[in-house]
Amino acid sequence: GKDINNNMEKAACATSSLVTQDDLQYHSLSKQQNESPQPLVGTGKKSPESLVKPDATPLSSPRHVRIKNWGSGMTFQDTLHHKAKGILTCRSKSCLGSIMTPKSLTRGPRDKPTPPDELLPQAIEFVNLSLEISVQDQIPPVCNDCQYYGSFKEAKIEEHLA
């Protein structure tokens, strides 16, 4: 099946890995050689085509990029990278082409510590919310105990004796 991004679903048991620059180089080499895949390093004589510099830029993108949805565990073969307008930020071990980090959701490191007049109200709000949630979680059991024992005091005495 396909999803809304034209990703083609692959078997869930297939192993997934990040696309590496080495994968892209291998693909561009095999494409140059009329789609006949050949190993980059042979066991015999090494031809100039089989030697690839690690920092060489690939001439073309692979037809499919394997993408894993870590939430569902499903693996897809994505083709949207063919429509990319810019060069993807790829290294030999990872590709950041599909990671979305909008500036509105990211913050850089602060130049200086948060001033106390800004930090104190945030801390007070955090503590109040924490206490409010904690108390709300305890209200039903306390009410049940009060109804069972007839009073809050008896409920607390029974709790300590148990």
From Swiss-Prot:
Q: How is the cofactor bound?
A: Binds 1 FAD.
Q: Where does FAD bind?
A: 160
Note how its activity is modulated: Regulated by calcium/calmodulin.
Note down the stretches annotated as region Disordered.
24-65
Q: Does the keyword Zinc apply?
A: yes
InterPro entries assigned to the protein according to its UniProt record, in alphabetical order: NOS (IPR050607), NOS_dom_1 (IPR044943), NOS_N_sf (IPR036119)
Where does it localize?
A: Cytoplasm, Cytosol
According to the UniProt entry, what is the EC number of this protein? 1.14.13.39
Q: What induces it?
A: By lipopolysaccharide (LPS).
What would be an example GO MF term here?
Answer: calmodulin binding
Q: Where is the composition biased (Polar residues)?
A: 24-37
Which transformation does this protein catalyse, written as a reaction? 2 L-arginine + 3 NADPH + 4 O2 + H(+) = 2 L-citrulline + 2 nitric oxide + 3 NADP(+) + 4 H2O
Residues that bind (6R)-L-erythro-5,6,7,8-tetrahydrobiopterin, according to the entry? 98
Q: Explain the purpose of this protein.
A: Produces nitric oxide (NO) which is a messenger molecule with diverse functions throughout the body. In macrophages, NO mediates tumoricidal and bactericidal actions. Also has nitrosylase activity and mediates cysteine S-nitrosylation of cytoplasmic target proteins such PTGS2/COX2. As component of the iNOS-S100A8/9 transnitrosylase complex involved in the selective inflammatory stimulus-dependent S-nitrosylation of GAPDH implicated in regulation of the GAIT complex activity and probably multiple targets including ANXA5, EZR, MSN and VIM.
Listed name of the protein: Nitric oxide synthase, inducible
Which species? Macaca mulatta
